[in-house]
From Swiss-Prot:
It comes from Oryza sativa subsp. japonica. This is Phytosulfokines 5. The gene is PSK5. Pfam families: PSK. It is found in: Secreted. The modification Sulfotyrosine is found at residues 93, 95. Belongs to the phytosulfokine family.
Length: 102
């Protein structure tokens, strides 16, 4: 007599077992990544020189240092004033993107 319960075929059972293992691995990896580092490991971490920034590097990339050093922005120079306003607006846009919206 055959049992009344259904048994899945071996390939289906193997696929389900593999899927279950992958899901468990994924969740265990996410949980371990979300945990803070132990105190002993955190003490060994040191920021590299120049790793922290205050926004000046963005201004340097946009050419602000060269303009100010060369004295290109003179009274009545509309092109320079316009470039400076666009640069400042762009920096404001970059730094306000990370703030929470009401």
């Amino acid at each position: 007599m055959r049992p009344t319960g259904r048994r899945s075929s071996p390939p289906v059972a193997a696929a389900l077992a593999l899927l279950l293992l992958l899901v468990l691995f994924f969740f265990s990896h996410c949980a371990s990544a979300a945990r803070p580092l132990p105190a002993s490991a955190a003490a060994e971490l040191v920021l590299q020189d120049g790793a922290t920034g205050n926004g000046d590097e963005v201004s340097e990339l946009m050419g602000a240092a060269e303009e100010e050093a060369a004295g290109l922005c003179e009274e009545g120079n509309e092109e320079c004033v316009e470039r400076r306003m666009l640069r400042d607006a762009h920096l404001d846009y970059i730094y306000t993107q990370k703030r929470n919206r009401p």
